[in-house]
C-alpha cells in the first residue's frame, strides 16, 4: 500500500511544492551567506532578527513541516479535504464523483491536476507516486505553471 503522506486529498504531490523542493536550498544558501558575514554575532542587535533567524532556519530545513492529511498544510478551511475525509476517500481521483465542482475550481490554478488524477486512476497510486518522484528530480514545481485566480472551496 502506498505511503500517502506526500499526496494531498485533491491529488497534488507535496514534493512538487516549492516549500519542499525550492525554498529549503535557497534558504540554506542565504543562511550560509549570512553566517559567513557574521550575522549570528551582530544580528541579534537588530529588532526582529532572532525571529527572522529562527524562521530562516525553519525554511532551510529539508524536513517536511506539514501535511495536508494532518490538516497542517494548505488552507485550514479546505472543503476538498473535509469532503474526502467524510467520504473516506484516500484521493479524490478515486471518488465516483471525480472531477467534482471542488476539484474543477482548484484545477483552474493547478493545471496538471485533472490529468494527474486520470493518470493516477489509470496506473494506480503506487506507480503514480513513483512518477511524481521522477518529476521532482526535474526541478518542476507547481508554482511554475499555477494560474491565478483559482478556487479553494470552503465547503
Show where each model-derived region lies.
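Hydrophobic scaffolds flanking metal-cofactor catalytic centers in soluble metalloenzymes
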Residues: 1-91, 98-128
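Short flanking/linker segments adjacent to small metal-binding domains or redox-active Cys/His motifs
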Residues: 60-72, 129-155
Amino acid at each position: 500500500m502506498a505511503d500517502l503522506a506526500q499526496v494531498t486529498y485533491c491529488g497534488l504531490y507535496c514534493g512538487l511544492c516549492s516549500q519542499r523542493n525550492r525554498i529549503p536550498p535557497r534558504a540554506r544558501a542565504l543562511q550560509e551567506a549570512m553566517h559567513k558575514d557574521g550575522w549570528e554575532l551582530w544580528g541579534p542587535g537588530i529588532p526582529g532578527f532572532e525571529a527572522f533567524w529562527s524562521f530562516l532556519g525553519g525554511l532551510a530545513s529539508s524536513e517536511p513541516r506539514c501535511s495536508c492529511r494532518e490538516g497542517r498544510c494548505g488552507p485550514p478551511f479546505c472543503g476538498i479535504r473535509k469532503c474526502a475525509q467524510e467520504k473516506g476517500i484516500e484521493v479524490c481521483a478515486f471518488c465516483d464523483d471525480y472531477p467534482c465542482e471542488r476539484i474543477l475550481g482548484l484545477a483552474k490554478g493547478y493545471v496538471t491536476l485533472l490529468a494527474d488524477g486520470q493518470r493516477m486512476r489509470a496506473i494506480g497510486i503506487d506507480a503514480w507516486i513513483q512518477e511524481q518522484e521522477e518529476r521532482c528530480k526535474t526541478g518542476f514545481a507547481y508554482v511554475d505553471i499555477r494560474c491565478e485566480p483559482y478556487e479553494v472551496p470552503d465547503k
